[in-house]
């Protein structure tokens, strides 16, 4: 049996207490093969500094960049009329988010920039005849996951180079709500602020 167990953390948004709890769950498990963080680590939360410190303690964790991590790198707040995720620049909610992005960046300083700069856009593993793809929302855009039609088109493209693959699993964060969609040999399953482990096997 080919198998691998993943612990997945995503969309922490500086909720350091939830992150501590997630790490405690991981530490209680003896069979975790890989920890993956799906991004949006710092903005929109109260404690980016201690969040960064905790994330740095995760052994061999793969960090994937979320849209809010990208905003930090792009210095979204320096744009003349910054907007995000389809919001109007005049929307008070958009303005509040942009202000929080700036505050978060100031709290983290260069250490936060370096950390986010080292993040990946996506990560892929092949376990037996199963391909598992991890990303924040999608490799083509980090602020909206793919529709099922888009995901199947991606699967068909990948299948050309990997004819041996029998099952595709696409794991993303960003949405903060459950999504478990299956079609043919494709499964889309997001996660949110908590942590869970996944096991994929071929007998």
Regions found by a protein language model. Name each.
Residues 31-32, 131, 166:
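Short loop/turn motifs at secondary-structure junctions
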